[in-house]
From Swiss-Prot:
Binding site for acetyl-CoA: 375, 381-382, 400, 418, 435
CDD domains, alphabetized: GT2_GlmU_N_bac (cd02540), LbH_GlmU_C (cd03353)
Catalyzed reactions per annotation: alpha-D-glucosamine 1-phosphate + acetyl-CoA = N-acetyl-alpha-D-glucosamine 1-phosphate + CoA + H(+); N-acetyl-alpha-D-glucosamine 1-phosphate + UTP + H(+) = UDP-N-acetyl-alpha-D-glucosamine + diphosphate
Region entry Pyrophosphorylase, spans: 1-225
An individual GO BP term: lipid A biosynthetic process
Name assigned to this protein: Bifunctional protein GlmU
Organism field: Carboxydothermus hydrogenoformans (strain ATCC BAA-161 / DSM 6008 / Z-2901)
Keyword Cytoplasm: yes
InterPro entries, A to Z: Bifunctional_GlmU, GlmU-like, GlmU_C_LbH, Hexapep, Hexapep_transf_CS, NTP_transferase_dom, Nucleotide-diphossugar_trans, Trimer_LpxA-like_sf
MF annotations from Gene Ontology: glucosamine-1-phosphate N-acetyltransferase activity; magnesium ion binding; UDP-N-acetylglucosamine diphosphorylase activity
Residues the entry annotates as binding UDP-N-acetyl-alpha-D-glucosamine: 6-9, 20, 70, 75-76, 135, 150, 165, 223, 328, 346, 361, 372
């Protein structure tokens, strides 16, 4: 079985310069979601029909799908015709590029029905409480499908039909190649409809089957930003429910946003307005949020992160982060560390049991075990041309309001006096003070 993705349309109601299918639903372009569903269903080769700003779709599917170009967007039937020279298998499945919630299991069921019945076409249908905008499935008195009529071409009686066409089909490739050139644009849109293949097949006595999907949300399309937001919410809701079934507590599933590739351990509690993105892995027994964003990071067990942003970092077990901390790419935090309020850490290692409690910037640094870094400490890592490393060894104590001008090394168990600006290394167990002496002028105020 080979597949065709219809991805040529502009999507006028999206009010965008981008093709509709490249808009993202929960971190992933719609057309990529459809492609992955096809591959997950066992489709061995995919042809994507592109048109409006085709290079944007090609960027996403390059190396994945064969690209067929529809220079003029003349309807779904014409798009399928454009793809036909690239289809080699006996059967083909055709899917719109704007159905991002579609499951591979649904496509598998459609393919199975098509192959087992030997039908020339099999249509995936669905019953909707509000079928407005969808093509209706018209059946005869015996329940056999006789045609699919689009909303704009339907009679008042046909508009009362609740069973709709999802726009997803399996076809016998040979007969489809024969029928597509016969389509006519005799409709309100003056387009060539793929749906018109069905009555032409029936006229020739060819078997047409249907299979009905139960979960209507899978086949929801996207025509505007409102629908895009609704489907995005659906993806996040599906992920949240799956995690809750696996032992994760989510205080308010409507206000958390967890990507599909995110892994979360049991007994973790997630508070509102928390974003877990990319390939993030969260351990067990953690407390995340509220108002926290974690992207492409690994978090250990029993760690608490609140009101903070963590991007491409690794955080160990029993770590406390926040509120208002920012861990930037390349940061690694060992077990038992405290990263407090208004602390920014960039491309640094913080050793086990160390503390950076307040108002500090730690960049391009290696911090050992059991180090205490006082409020207002800055690693001055950039000289205007290059970034330099700061090393703070085990047990060191850095006083508040200290500037460490890199490259610099603070030895084991050394102490740095508050208010110092250091430009030279500090030996082990030494006290370093680099500030002016205090002078009190008696009777200064008259």
């Amino acid at each position: 079985m080979e597949g065709i993705i219809l991805a040529a349309g502009k999507g006028t109601r999206m009010k965008s310069d981008l093709p509709k299918v490249v808009h993202e639903v929960a971190e992933k372009p719609m057309v990529l979601r459809v492609y992955e569903a096809l591959v997950g269903a066992g489709v061995k080769r995919v042809v994507a029909v592109v048109g409006y700003r085709k290079e944007k779709v090609e960027e996403i599917l390059r190396g994945r799908a064969v690209i067929a170009v529809q220079e003029e967007q003349l309807g779904t039937g014409h798009a399928a015709l454009v793809a036909m020279p690239y289809v080699e298998d006996e059967n083909v499945i055709i899917v719109p590029g704007d159905t991002p919630l579609l499951k591979a299991s649904t496509l598998q069921a459609l393919i199975k029905k098509h192959l087992e019945t030997g039908a020339y076409a099999t249509v995936l249908t669905c019953f909707l409480s509000n079928p407005y905008g969808y093509g209706r499935i018209v059946r005869d008195g015996y329940g056999k499908i006789i045609k699919i009529v689009e909303e704009k071409d339907a009679t008042l009686e046909e508009k009362q039909i609740a069973e709709v066409n999802t726009g997803i089909y399996c076809f016998n490739t040979k007969i489809l190649k024969e029928i597509l050139p016969l389509l006519k644009a005799e409709n309100a849109q003056k387009e060539y409809y793929l749906t018109d293949v069905i009555p032409l097949l029936l006229e020739r006595g060819k078997v047409v089957e249907t299979i009905t999907i139960q979960d209507e949300t899978e086949v929801y399309g996207v025509n505007d930003r409102v629908q895009l937001a609704r489907l995005t919410k659906g993806v996040y809701r599906r992920k949240a429910e799956a995690l809750m079934q696996e032992g994760v507590t989510i205080i308010d599933p409507e206000t958390v946003y967890i990507g599909e590739e995110v892994v979360v351990g049991s007994d973790t509690v997630i508070y509102p307005n928390t974003y877990l993105e990319g390939k993030t892995v969260i351990g067990s027994g953690c407390r995340l949020g509220p108002n926290t964003r974690i992207t492409d990071s690994v978090i250990g067990n029993n760690t608490e992160i609140t009101f903070s942003v963590i991007i491409q970092a690794r955080v160990g077990d029993e770590v406390n982060v926040g509120p208002f901390a920012y861990l930037r790419p390349g940061t690694e935090i060992a077990n038992g560390v405290k990263i407090g309020d208004f602390v920014e850490i960039k491309k640094s290692f913080i050793g086990e049991g160390s503390k950076v409690p307040h108002l500090s910037y730690i960049g391009d640094a290696v911090v050992g075990k059991g180090v205490n870094i006082g409020a207002g400490t800055i690693t001055c890592n950039y000289d205007g041309k290059n970034k330099w490393e700061t090393v703070i060894e085990d047990g060191a104590f850095i006083g508040s309001n200290t500037n460490l001008v890199a490259p610099i090394k603070i030895g084991k168990n050394a102490v740095v006096g508050a208010g110092s600006t250091l430009t030279e290394d500090v030996p082990e167990k030494a006290l370093a003070i680099a500030r002016s002496r205090q002078v009190n002028k008696e009777d200064y105020v008259k």
